[in-house]
């Protein structure tokens, strides 16, 4: 089973947002949700991930991207990773509010079919860590963890 190390030994994976094919307001929305997910990771681990826009390729990274309606309209980073990994994204391309959650040893790829699908994919990380959607409104405190892994099964 493939496991992606989101947090271990006081170190979290960085979050990389591919915004090359996004309108500015959509990019702001994706970044805002990425910040909320970072806060959820911090609630569980005590360490807040860094958000960036380019791959490091030497450390674990969560890559977030909105796919275009066609492969010609994908973001540059998404297109590169899809080609590099020979991924089939046809299951979500052109659909509404869908996402792919792809786990590799060094990357967790979250590809959304649109902005909302990408947001759902990012919040899936919080859900898998055991963070309640009520954490902000009802002071529901998530359980602290020494290690956080994402697996290919979710």
Predicted regions and their residues:
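Contiguous, structured surface segment used for ligand recognition
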Residues: 1-154
